[in-house]
Amino acid sequence: MNLEFYRGKRVFVTGHTGFKGSWLCRMLVGAGAVVTGYSLEPPTTPNLFSLAGLEGKMTSVIGDIRDFAALKAAFDAAQPEIVLHLAAQPIVRDSYKDPRYTYETNVMGTVNLLECVRTAQTPPRSVLNVTTDKVYQNNEWCWGYRENEPLDGFDPYSNSKSCSELVTHSYKNSFFADGSVAISTARAGNVIGGGDFANDRIIPDCVRAMAKGESIGVRNPYSTRPYQHVLEPLAAYLLIAQCQYEDNRYAGYYNVGPDDCDCVTTGTLVDLFCQAWGDGAAWENRAEANAPHEANFLKLDCSKLKSTFGWKPRWHMAECMQKTVAFSKVWLSGGNIPAEMDKEIKEFLSE
């Protein structure tokens, strides 16, 4: 895969200061795209956006996706050809603490963005709304969910993303049925990779424990998730956005996840982390009594993405973990993060 298509393209990215957004902007900037990002301040300290060397290479607008006037001003100034919507409140456990904020951000934020598209003097040709694997009604099935399964997330985060999907479907059918704007959603699994500093995510928890010389505490070691390296879904997003830009018949709804062999339990994932880290890394089960509900078994069927675009995952879980650990050790040693990002992106795209 190469990103030559994006050279000179005007791309508007919401949520650009987050973990996935920072990696995405590094990919786009490296491809020569004209990137405008709209997002809150980076959500953690430290954060990947500040480490990624993007200052001066893109337009970064700090704003709240709930603020329609500010969002529209940034959107209209950018005059984007392609829109990638990643802005979200992304943490399940945080959604239990503040459900209203979660719904306002994830549902009305999507409405605000699509209103910008609808009312633009020159609308973009390609729009992709990034949701989550958790949009589906989870029946704890042993097989992967397909794109035609019912959308009914349980917790406020998952449910707000189900709502974001429905909002997107409505706007697509109501205002863009003529295909003038190609609109898709991408439902991606759990991502791992270097540069994630969020709370309540397993790999950041692992890295923090290693930095302190502690054992890793794992809340849900037996839960199964479609883990994948962060570059996997980002490459899929860029592929979908490009293909529907060139031919609006590709607009649709796509799962993005790993092969079945890489849908592992969290305990297995942490085992792989410890093996890659070395130095006696170990973990322990710290299951919490009366913890908020989280799905136990979740897999995606990505046949549609594979058959439509010839897409396939590049890195299996052991290699994902090796890349993640290598990045984390570069960061802990004060190394060159932009160079490490570019190295991983180049290796990924060359496979």
Regions found by a protein language model. Give the residues of each.
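N-terminal Rossmann-like NAD(P)+-binding domain of SDR-like oxidoreductases, especially those catalyzing
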Residues: 1-188, 348
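Generic structural signal for small/hydrophobic residues in well-ordered secondary structure
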Residues: 6, 16-18, 83, 171, ...
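Residue-level marker for well-ordered alpha-helical positions
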Residues: 22, 69, 204, 267-268, ...
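C-terminal substrate-binding subdomain of Rossmann-fold SDR/epimerase-dehydratase oxidoreductases
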Residues: 30-33, 63, 210-351
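Flexible, glycine-rich phosphate/dinucleotide-binding loops
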Residues: 43-44, 136, 192, 262, ...
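Residues in well-ordered alpha-helical elements
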Residues: 68-69, 81, 93, 100, ...
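NAD(P)-dependent short-chain dehydrogenase/reductase
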Residues: 139-144, 148, 156-157, 162-245, ...
